[in-house]
């Protein structure tokens, strides 16, 4: 079954909702954005997450030192990196890694040392999907996440199109820029039970 990552959580209530609804991954954004949390805030929220739900730290062009500090302070299970990735960034990390790839039309998939790939829209967090026809995932060495403009109305179609390891959502479970607990529940329900579209 396709796994679910709910990203950009910053409150106790949102974390508890995502966990209770069946999220497999919880994402904390450490890169500058409206969803950014500090290491200290994430460490407190991480205490609410059971061991079978994985904690993911999201970074943009980080140094290896930044990754190691966050892994240690928050107890991250995975790091997700957007932007520039040094050749040795993922070597011998104490946790798994996800490299984000912006799907911009050239169809290029990088040769990555990361454990997972995540395919996102050209502007991450914009709520806009990329053109699914521009991405060919056949022959990929790594399992992959699909992100970029997913919501409760299109996520089942995305799963049918790509058969991904996991789907990732942030703005698609928000209302007026804040995490919407009902949207979180409905999104996860659609993924887990294959219910497509609104009635």
From Swiss-Prot:
User: Keywords assigned by UniProt?
Assistant: Amino-acid biosynthesis, Aromatic amino acid biosynthesis, Isomerase, Tryptophan biosynthesis
Q: Which Pfam families match?
A: PRAI
Mind listing the GO biological process terms from this record?
A: L-tryptophan biosynthetic process
Q: Name one GO molecular function term.
A: phosphoribosylanthranilate isomerase activity
Keyword Nucleotide-binding tagged = no
Q: Where are the transmembrane segments?
A: none
Q: Could you say which enzyme class this protein belongs to?
A: isomerase
Query: Where on the tree of life does the source sit, at the highest rank?
Result: Bacteria
According to the UniProt entry, what is the EC number of this protein? 5.3.1.24
Catalysed reaction equations from the record: N-(5-phospho-beta-D-ribosyl)anthranilate = 1-(2-carboxyphenylamino)-1-deoxy-D-ribulose 5-phosphate
Quote the Gene3D superfamilies the UniProt record gives: Aldolase class I
State which pathway it belongs to.
Amino-acid biosynthesis; L-tryptophan biosynthesis; L-tryptophan from chorismate: step 3/5
Q: Which NCBIfam families match?
A: PRK01222.1-7
Give the record's family classification: Belongs to the TrpF family.
- Write down what this protein is called: N-(5'-phosphoribosyl)anthranilate isomerase
Gene giving rise to this polypeptide = trpF
